[in-house]
Amino acid sequence: MSAANMPTTTGAQGSGNQVPTTSTTIVNHFRELIKDPKNLDEASNYLFQTLLDDAVVGIFNETHHLRKSGNLAALDGVPEDSTYRMCEMPNLDIFGISTAKKPMDCTCPNCDRLVAAARFAPHLEKCMGMGRISSRIASRRLATKEGATSAHLHSAGNTGGTDDEDDVDWSSDKRRKKSNQNSRNNGSKKNNGKSF
């Protein structure tokens, strides 16, 4: 038997009618050829040729499938970056990022002024009237308005009264207690002038 007459895998012959050769059929055919010592050279050539054909056809089929599905670039994998380049320009670090400090300015949405980033929150609070001082002023305004409206109601002869007027004023007791404690000390220190 010559190498041309040896059965090969379906991929090697190119016909789609044959059943694909499995490894067990290859091994069985190889054992038949080895039984006769004269055919040993033929058997080794047959085994080598079928294994080589199988490998080549497998790679060809995989590459063809990747090309048709548009994934051939995935076969190469992710390209590696070029060797680590260091940037040696002034005011840049080794990665090419600027090392100079940039002044961060923010624009106030209320008054459209440029404000330093560190001062933006306090500025915005004051600009929008949300600060502590603005809060106190607003509380005073409300208190004076309420005082004016309640005086207006009393002067109009409203005898029904409101719920607030009927309630006991609990905060006045606290004020009275504070003033009593302050008068007991008569301005002296807590330790009554004793030094340790």
UniProtKB/Swiss-Prot annotation:
GO cellular component: cytoplasm; DUBm complex; nuclear pore; nucleoplasm; SAGA complex
Keywords: Activator, Chromatin regulator, Cytoplasm, Metal-binding, mRNA transport, Nucleus, Phosphoprotein, Protein transport, Transcription, Transcription regulation, Translocation, Transport, Zinc, Zinc-finger
GO biological process terms held by the UniProt record: chromatin organization; mRNA export from nucleus; positive regulation of DNA-templated transcription; protein transport; regulation of transcription by RNA polymerase II
Gene Ontology molecular function: transcription coactivator activity; zinc ion binding
Listed InterPro entries: SAGA_su_Sgf11, SGF11
Disordered: region residues: 1-22, 144-196
Chief localisation class: nucleus
Compartment list: Nucleus, Nucleoplasm; Cytoplasm
Compositional bias per record (Low complexity), positions renumbered to this chain: 180-196
List of residues that carry Phosphoserine: S172
Phosphoprotein keyword on record: yes
Pfam families, per database record: Sgf11
ZnF SGF11-type span: 106-127
Family as reported in the entry's similarity comment: Belongs to the SGF11 family.
Its biological purpose: Component of the transcription regulatory histone acetylation (HAT) complex SAGA, a multiprotein complex that activates transcription by remodeling chromatin and mediating histone acetylation and deubiquitination. Within the SAGA complex, participates in a subcomplex that specifically deubiquitinates histone H2B. The SAGA complex is recruited to specific gene promoters by activators, where it is required for transcription. Required for nuclear receptor-mediated transactivation. Binds independently on SAGA to promoters in an RNA-dependent manner.
Quaternary organization: Component of some SAGA transcription coactivator-HAT complexes, at least composed of Ada2b, not/nonstop, Pcaf/Gcn5, Sgf11 and Spt3. Within the SAGA complex, Sgf11, e(y)2, and not/nonstop form an additional subcomplex of SAGA called the DUB module (deubiquitination module). Interacts directly with not/nonstop. Interacts with the AMEX complex component xmas-2. Interacts with Cbp80; important for promoter recruitment of Sgf11 that is not associated with the DUB module.
HAMAP family: Sgf11
Record text about domains: The long N-terminal helix forms part of the 'assembly lobe' of the SAGA deubiquitination module. The C-terminal SGF11-type zinc-finger domain together with the C-terminal catalytic domain of not/nonstop forms the 'catalytic lobe' of the SAGA deubiquitination module.
Protein's UniProt name: SAGA-associated factor 11 homolog
Lineage: Eukaryota, Metazoa, Ecdysozoa, Arthropoda, Hexapoda
